Amino acid sequence: MTGEKIRSLHRDQKPSKDEDLLEPDEEATAGGTFTRTGKLKNSKMFSNHKVIRSPSNPALLQNHHQQISPITPGESKTDAYFPVHECVFKGDIRRLSSLIRSHSIGQKDNHGNTPLHLAVMLGNKECAHLLLAHNAPVKVKNAQGWSPLAEAISYGDRQMITALLRKLKQQSRESVEEKRPRLLKALKELGDFYLELHWDFQSWVPLLSRILPSDACKIYKQGINIRLDTTLIDFTDMKCQRGDLSFIFNGDAAPSESFVVLDNEQKVYQRIHHEESEMETEEEVDILMSSDIYSATLSTKSISFTRAQTGWLFREDKTERVGNFLADFHLVNGLILESRKRREHLTEEDILRNKAIMESLSKGGNLMEQNFEPVRRQSLTPPPPNTITWEEYISAENGKAPHLGRELVCKENKKTFKATIAMSQDFPLGIESLLNVLEVIAPFKHFNKLREFVQMKLPPGFPVKLDIPVFPTITATVTFQEFRYGEFEDAIFTIPDDYKEDPSRFPDL
């Protein structure tokens, strides 16, 4: 079991203006200094997450309020009334039961917290379970970039972490099913084609540079079927696993049988399932409770594109061929990779053990070699009772909410991401069509990163070559080398007769 299984729970989230381009668990070697922050009891200005300086996204919050709970003219978000949040904050389960029928439980307050965030941070288990029973969103993040699940891990109640994890999986499955009809319709309208692209991974960490892979991927699309051939089986947690792999999506099959992965070397296949056993869920909870809590975003607030230049004496815009396509090269400016790590829920033993694991992985080792087996974790002792009043909380300045829950131990790292992108007007495929194809093959993590990156507002054309962040210390250069329309034999979208099923061949898919 690796961290990839945990990260896979978050794959269908759409990026916001500050792109959630890196999932939790991915900041293996980012720098920074841990800072412990406590409560400021005798001040009207409360400092929450002092080390975290990333502002909230006012536009996103405003849009959310407009959709869910309109604010009357002349009323600011700070002055807005949040009755569901208030009764959760005060632990009024009876009033919550009444309000839940007529009010949105997904609304964010002026600190970006939903009622579920507050219930978890304050340890109000009754309120939290009631909200979950009414399908309160688990994936949503507050202004500091933390989800209710992240806050639950910090609080340390195992039962609550498990309940949130199960609900998150359920909501992820439902989201996939909701998208399926639209996705199939888009694929059907798209012509049949063959697409070849190349991945080249780099890092500024010397030890990592030696073990980073490259990969040539071939994508076949016919009707509502897709096949992806790749040599990169697994690329997570600072390690990579090579092989001869094919991923097949059959749009005509039942959802439970749509996705199949073939191991062409061992001649076995595995269907990608969404249901997990009780033991698998418990193991994931153990890993969550013994690992750092991560939040990483690629801030695009200040993004801009300038034409790349070529020539020594006489400078001119850079235009050259990428594969078969003429492309204009642009420099990507203003991208900042922000990563945060929390570990207030960990013991010194946990921290030393995790550090040893990451050092081994950075040198080319893997979890299997270390006989890694998560230890069954018990609930932590609850943090001291909350002393902040509702009035103090809701009237605090945006982005400076008084801290609720366990005292923070947090580290932040910011890194400017320098990138180049080549846009071609000649490429036959549009970005929207590419997004639909990439959404199908999102179980492969690096493809999910590509999908999220190209959703940004790019210069005109199709991105035939681009640099994207995959992990905080690792980037990838993706090159679209070949594209052609054509028809293919049905056999390439089916499981060969001599392949045998192995349900456990790819445990992280």
UniProtKB/Swiss-Prot annotation:
Its main location: endoplasmic reticulum. It is found in: Endoplasmic reticulum membrane. ANK repeats lie at residues 79-110, 111-140, 144-173. Keywords: ANK repeat, Chaperone, Endoplasmic reticulum, Membrane, Repeat. SUPFAM superfamilies: Ankyrin repeat (SSF48403). Disulfide bonds: none annotated. Residues 1-19 have a biased composition (Basic and acidic residues). Residues 1-42 are annotated as: Disordered. One of its GO terms (cellular component) is endoplasmic reticulum membrane. Pfam families: Ank_2, ANKRD13_C. InterPro entries: ANKRD13, ANKRD13_C, Ankyrin_rpt, Ankyrin_rpt-contain_sf. PANTHER family: ANKYRIN REPEAT DOMAIN-CONTAINING PROTEIN 13, ANKYRIN REPEAT DOMAIN-CONTAINING PROTEIN 13C. Acts as a molecular chaperone for G protein-coupled receptors, regulating their biogenesis and exit from the ER. This is Ankyrin repeat domain-containing protein 13C. The gene is ankrd13c.
